[in-house]
Amino acid sequence: MTESVLDYMSRLGRDARAASRLLARAATAQKNRALLAAADALDAARAELSLANEQDLAAGRANGLEPAMLDRLALTPARIDDMIEGLRQVATLPDPIGEIRDMRYVPSGIQIGKMRVPLGVVGIIYESRPNVTIDAASLCLKSGNATILRGGSEAIHSNQAIARCIQQGLAEAGLPAAAVQVVETTDRAAVGALISMPEYVDVIVPRGGKGLIERISREAKVPVIKHLDGICHVYIDVAADLDKAIRVADNAKTQRYAPCNTMETLLVHAGIAERVLPPLATIYREKGVELRGDAATRALLGADVLEATEEDWRTEYNAPILSIRIVDGLDAAIEHINTYGSQHTDAIITENFSDARRFLAEVDSASVMVNASTRFADGFEYGLGAEIGISTDKLHARGPVGLEGLTSEKYVVFGDGHVRT
């Protein structure tokens, strides 16, 4: 690359801005055609994708990447299937662009409503997880946004292989290549440039480690949609159904350890602890989960449960480690979650309707659940299509960010020669 990183990123930004204007007026059928063609291209390129991904995995192992990071990096056949299905599902979703709602007449006689429009250009910065390339590209494309994707250097070969499939889909639909651009340099200066171009980029969505997201939040000159941690809780209430409690608490922790919606702390009402914790502990031990608990938990489950420290309650492990606390009741559970949680996803297991309603109302998180695993906190599971990320902010989007989260609204006004007096 002969041009400087800043010049290169500025060129990507200019091209994305121009493409965003074309995308904003693209027909739904044209956008869907690009998505379906990209899905077909992925399906046909499975061998190429696997080969590129193996290059990244081999380099990651050689560089000592942690198991959780390698898990996120891997493009298994099932994950390739999920990417293809994600593209096809997004193609079936209703197109929000151009939708006009809340039309009403006001006393002056004019008619006012709101029209849904694209944000413009979305910058995505992410580590590992090459599937994010597809998730982000599909949602941005369907919502009429151009996107600039800056993946981690550890996934460079995987991302480039995926990008070729996306470009094929764009070409077949007659859409500009700059609608989806993957940053091809691994120079870290590209991140600084991308988050400092408000003239070209309308919003940044970072997905990665806490350090990366904190840096972007601190330095960005562009609005950021983000979450820092996934410290998710399951609270087993005294009125819980034992079978449901065991099934959900098992799945929330052990279905996968790396995702941000995995349970990291289990809270159990003291009145049900003796019945539910021993069978749960057996399941966790059989699956190799390290248990850490407060004094009451250790007294109940035995000395092999490590002492939980104050830091444990604030930690997103992304690993087979679980903190357990026995609490006096719902008030203590809510207080613990609102003190130590990350406002991501928290669940209560209970058959008591009033307890469930209190939990939903008082836990300050983006997703709050009753009798369901925290692992459901996902755009695909919510019917949004593939998500672009999860936001724990309260502006502009909150929770899994799908198509609607990538749009804004503008007022539209109809008159008949009306003038203000």
From Swiss-Prot:
This is Gamma-glutamyl phosphate reductase. It is an enzyme of class 1 (oxidoreductase). The keyword Metal-binding does not apply. Pfam families: Aldedh (PF00171). GO terms for cellular component: cytoplasm. Catalyzes the NADPH-dependent reduction of L-glutamate 5-phosphate into L-glutamate 5-semialdehyde and phosphate. The product spontaneously undergoes cyclization to form 1-pyrroline-5-carboxylate. GO terms for molecular function: glutamate-5-semialdehyde dehydrogenase activity; NADP binding. Pathway: Amino-acid biosynthesis; L-proline biosynthesis; L-glutamate 5-semialdehyde from L-glutamate: step 2/2. It is found in: Cytoplasm. Keywords: Amino-acid biosynthesis, Cytoplasm, NADP, Oxidoreductase, Proline biosynthesis. The lineage of its organism: Bacteria, Pseudomonadati, Pseudomonadota, Gammaproteobacteria, Pseudomonadales. InterPro entries: Ald_DH/histidinol_DH, Ald_DH_C, Ald_DH_N, Aldehyde_DH_dom, G-glutamylP_reductase_CS, Glu-5-SA_DH, GPR_dom. Belongs to the gamma-glutamyl phosphate reductase family. The keyword Cytoplasm applies. Its EC number is 1.2.1.41. It comes from Pseudomonas aeruginosa (strain LESB58). Its main location: cytoplasm. CDD domains: ALDH_F18-19_ProA-GPR (cd07079). It catalyses: L-glutamate 5-semialdehyde + phosphate + NADP(+) = L-glutamyl 5-phosphate + NADPH + H(+). The gene is proA. Disulfide bonds: none annotated. One of its GO terms (biological process) is L-proline biosynthetic process.
